[in-house]
UniProtKB/Swiss-Prot annotation:
Name used for this protein in its record: Large ribosomal subunit protein uL16
Function: Binds 23S rRNA and is also seen to make contacts with the A and possibly P site tRNAs.
KW Isomerase (keyword) present: no
Record keyword Magnesium present: no
CDD domains, per database record: Ribosomal_L16_L10e
UniProt similarity note: Belongs to the universal ribosomal protein uL16 family.
A GO molecular-function descriptor: structural constituent of ribosome
PANTHER family, alphabetized: 50S/60S RIBOSOMAL PROTEIN L16, LARGE RIBOSOMAL SUBUNIT PROTEIN UL16M
HAMAP family: Ribosomal_uL16 (MF_01342)
Quaternary structure annotation from Swiss-Prot or TrEMBL: Part of the 50S ribosomal subunit.
One example of a Gene Ontology biological process annotation: translation
Cellular component annotations (GO), alphabetically ordered: cytosolic large ribosomal subunit
Length: 137
């Protein structure tokens, strides 16, 4: 699971995710990628399951880059606890994805149809709509 080693603040406000991605919207390392099409909070477990699906579909050939990291803590109060008494403890970490952000990349060692299949399977594991992109358009 992806968890930051340190963070400046222990707990943060919820906030809102507005607008499109400012950076990270183009392919940098590989030739195929998965781009977010809508707003979503990607948990560390989503990233890990998507990574596993991609590597298993590619049969560990080619290289996979994870372009996101969950750096925002999400707190939650336990069940059957009354209101008040402070904010709950941290349950998990999320990455706040905006539309246009590249989430995963795959190297060009892999055939395009296999890369598309792997990234479409990974899309099913993520909490938002994504699309397949490539440098070969």
């Amino acid at each position: 699971m992806f968890v930051p080693k340190k963070s400046k603040y222990k707990k943060v406000f919820k906030g809102r995710i507005k607008g499109n991605a400012k950076g990270g919207s183009t392919l940098s390392f590989g030739d195929y990628g998965l781009k977010a099409m809508e707003v979503g909070k990607v948990q560390s477990k989503h990233i890990e399951t998507a990574r596993r699906v991609i590597s298993r579909t590619l049969k560990r050939s080619g290289k996979v880059w994870i372009r996101i990291f969950p750096d925002t803590p999400v707190s939650k109060k336990p069940a059957d606890v009354r209101m008040g008494k402070g904010k709950g403890s941290i349950e998990f970490w999320v990455f706040k994805a905006k539309p246009g952000r590249v989430l995963f990349e795959i190297s060009s060692d892999v055939p395009m149809h296999l890369a598309r299949l792997a990234l479409e399977k990974a899309t099913a594991k993520l909490p938002m709509k994504c699309k397949f992109i490539s440098n070969h358009n």
